[in-house]
Design a protein with these regions (language model features):
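Helix C-cap/helix->beta junction micro-motif
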Residues: 29, 134, 196-197, 313, ...
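PLP-dependent enzyme catalytic core of the Aspartate aminotransferase-like
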Residues: 159-160, 344-353, 359-394
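A short helix-loop-beta submotif of the ANL/AMP-binding
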Residues: 133-139
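Conserved core segment of the aminotransferase class I/II
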Residues: 229-300, 309, 391-392
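Conserved glycine-rich beta-strand-loop-beta hairpin in the small C-terminal domain of fold type I
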Residues: 282, 298-307, 317-330
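Conserved PLP-anchoring active-site segment centered on the Schiff-base-forming lysine
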Residues: 109-131
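N-terminal small-domain helix-loop-helix segment of the aminotransferase-like
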Residues: 2-98, 105, 157, 284-287, ...
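Active-site phosphate-binding strand-loop segment of PLP-dependent enzymes
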Residues: 139, 143-217
Length: 394
């Protein structure tokens, strides 16, 4: 009782998330919310029907700790079907409360205090918090846009980030918030360094089915590279692929000893999750290829719609190769700071975005960049673009 702030020191840098702040702004001002990455449509009807059936037929109690067998089998089948990866559903897959818990449980399971985690910035903000909760230290490697607008890391900077306390590399591809899809050469360098330094990899691949047809490279799971399956925990979720972000159903796949470690931690975080929703996600994972390609094509059209509208409104646009998000530079509109720009945007034109600098340790690298989500209905995007054009008019 000797301090006025009861929060532990390692968590004091983390306030209310930018998503909560900007979503509250949207509600308060009636703005179009393009800040947070959630769709405004529901997922495939087969999945919704399966969830309703599960609710009606007694799937409302605790599911098994690792997840129901049907979902674990569906995850294994999905990874075999799309990526040629073989996982034993009875020991190499665990179901989690979304990818956020999967990342947190993986880091908590593998990192001792003082261990170092290499991550690529800008990064999803929960990564930094999960690393801090473990008492570990993050070592960011900055992705920078080239002349073509595509982000990339400096291989020398990545090599320099490895050291005697490096425990794991946290890799997100397709990448939030930049929309970057890591190339085979980039992944090969990551894999070589992981093997050389004998470290683990945790890969967040929730946008695995949102790689657009004009991307410079297809999505390649790091676990498919030589020597990486045995040291990689691969994470994905239903939220982004099936437009059900509120369900919070994710999974971790990997070698049995690593997955067992994650499960040991997960059981003391949420214990189990989403009993009646797990059978529905199992159904969704078995949908035909046409669902996955159609979903991608639909989201790509929305990307094109919003990117063109942002350019017309006067932003500098860094077109993404995947994900839900497009990065925009506020400099052409006279902006100097993304946080200030985003806080004023709802009043100026009735649209909400999020400042990208909050995803960086190197704040200057993202100071003039902001992120918009395009996973919204076309008419919502059209209204947002109409409002954003007021910025240029003014």
């Amino acid at each position: 009782m000797t301090t006025t702030d009861p929060l532990v020191a390692r968590m004091r840098p983390f306030g209310t998330t930018v998503f909560a702040e900007m979503s509250a702004l949207a509600v308060r001002t009636g703005a179009v919310n393009l800040g947070q990455g959630f769709p405004d449509t529901d997922g495939p009807p087969e999945m919704l029907a399966a969830a309703a059936e599960a609710l009606r037929t007694g799937h409302n109690q605790y599911p098994p700790g690792p997840g129901i067998p049907a979902l674990r089998a569906a995850v294994a089948g999905h990874q075999r079907r799309f990526w040629g990866l073989e996982y034993d559903p009875d020991g190499e897959i665990v179901v989690t409360a979304g990818a956020t818990e999967a990342v947190a449980a993986s880091i908590l399971a593998l990192c001792e205090p003082g261990d170092e985690v290499i991550c690529f910035e800008p990064y999803y903000d929960s990564y930094a918090a999960s690393i801090a909760l473990a008492g570990a230290v993050r070592r960011p490697v900055t992705l920078r846009p080239g002349a073509d607008g595509r982000y990339a890391y400096d291989p020398d900077e990545l090599r320099a980030a490895f050291g005697p306390r490096t425990r794991l590399v946290l890799l997100n591809s397709p990448h939030n918030p930049t929309g970057r899809v890591f190339t085979a050469d980039e992944l090969t360098t990551v894999a070589e360094l992981c093997r050389e330094h004998d470290v683990y990899a945790v890969t967040d691949e929730v946008y695995e089915h949102l790689v657009f047809t004009d991307a410079a490279a297809p999505h390649v799971p790091l676990a498919t590279l030589p020597g990486m399956r045995e040291r990689t925990l691969r994470i994905s979720s239903a939220g982004k692929t099936f437009s059900c972000t509120g369900w919070k159903v994710g999974w971790v796949s990997g070698p049995a000893p690593l997955v067992a470690a994650v499960l040991r931690v997960k059981q003391f975080l949420t214990f189990v999750n989403a009993g009646p929703l797990q059978p529905a996600v199992a159904v969704a994972l078995g949908l035909p290829d046409a669902y996955f390609t159609g979903f991608r094509d639909d989201i790509q059209r929305r990307r094109d719609q919003l990117a063109a509208g942002l350019a017309d409104a006067g932003f500098g646009v860094l077109a993404p190769e995947g994900t839900y998000f497009v990065t925009a530079d506020v400099t052409p509109l006279g902006g100097r700071d993304g946080v200030e720009f985003c806080r004023a945007l709802p009043q100026r034109c009735g649209v909400v975005a999020v400042p990208t600098q909050v995803f960086y340790d190197d704040v200057e690298a993202g100071r003039r960049l902001i992120r918009f989500a395009f996973c919204k209905r076309p008419e919502v995007l059209a209204e947002a673009v109409t409002r954003l054009r007021r910025l240029r008019a003014n």
